[in-house]
Amino acid sequence: MSETADDLFTREDPIFATKELLEISHLPGEGRIVGRDDEISQLATAVNPAIFGQSPSNVLIYGKTGTGKSLCAKYVSRRLVETAGDEGVTATFAYVDCAQDTTETQAVQTIADSVNAVDDTEINIPDKGLSTSTYYKRLWRILDQRFDVVVVILDEIDKLSDDDILMQLSRAGEAGKITDCKLGVLGISNKIQYKDRMDERVKSSLCEREFVFPPYDANQLRNIMEARSDAFRDGVLEPSTIPRAAALAAREHGDARKAIDILRYAGEIAQSNGSTTVKEQFVTQARQRAETDRFRELIRGSTPHSRYVLQALAVLSLSNGQQEGFRTSRVYEIYENICRQEGSDSLSLRRVRDLLKEHAFLDIIEQSKHSGGSAEGSYTNHQLLEDPEVVKDVLTEDS
């Protein structure tokens, strides 16, 4: 190997100054949160009683992906903890990604582990190995021992396998599970219709307040990216780069998460090309990469047959154009072909219909019902909302 150590590594990043400002997990300060003053104020009002040691309202937050729901919930919760401390109230918040912790046991374990300090409580919260009821009992003990108020953020709440944890958390005080701690829940969902699936008892206790976060417009997206532009070194961004990224993201339902991803990927593409500037032309390439990563994350954990159904729709879309979608029978025919190619037994038509409904719920596809008259009867068309090339590429690389 001919490279010296000095040749092998770059000691100074020529593009990024503070790259973490462009990471989705980064929680920015108030000055970097753009276009959500009203939503932050509404959330703060809902949980305001907590700073005095009283029960915060339970809140359900709706909005499309990338509209700032998680960001604002975390920001308000962090500020609540700080302000409550100034008032002599011991508070904290726990965050659960329900797309990862989909079961009741996983979610309650994450909450208990997040709020625990074993040196103080002498309560152990193992990753696994306890019953759900034991995790709950330990959680209630921790809350009463350590805190006056706790807020639990359940992100992507619609990914939970059932409503049981919502019932337990929203009624913990009423049921006498905790006596010295007040507990509030902030549920976050991309699906406005999610509430329709809830148990009526959960709905009555969890949905005390409801807020809808609208999509960002192009100007707001531009401001969001400009507020994080110091992630880059001075002078590396071409003047047209941020406006172009904002325009592309605005076209995709005002998704700020995607806008930030596009900007970060454009910088990485500049790095890999050896460019000293982040050019507008890199933004288009970055959008494709962001779209691919977003879809990959969307189908993470899905079953092989769930993927075969999507693959069938991608095949139809690429062969025939999107049209107005494709009938269930046609999708099923291509799905069966894919199953044969994969050496897998196909599921029943009824089960494939269920999988298509699940994809529609996740906004991966759109379903529309049609009447074919007395000769054909009614039928359902299914249309991909994702780029079929992206769907094909992601499903092919994972097969």
Model-derived regions, located:
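Walker A/P-loop nucleotide-binding motif
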Residues: 55-75
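Terminal-proximal interaction/regulatory segments of ATP-powered molecular machines
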Residues: 323-399
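A short, basic N-terminal segment
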Residues: 1-57
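Short, hydrophobic-biased segments on the C-terminal half of alpha helices
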Residues: 77, 166, 353-357
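Hydrophobic residues on short alpha-helical segments
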Residues: 44, 306-314, 332
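C-terminal helical "lid" subdomain and adjoining coupling/linker elements of P-loop NTPases
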Residues: 60, 235, 244-305, 320-324, ...
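Mid-core helix/loop region of P-loop NTP-binding domains shared across ATPases and GTPases
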Residues: 3-5, 14, 102-112, 117-168, ...
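AAA+/P-loop NTPase substrate/partner-engagement loops
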Residues: 82-113
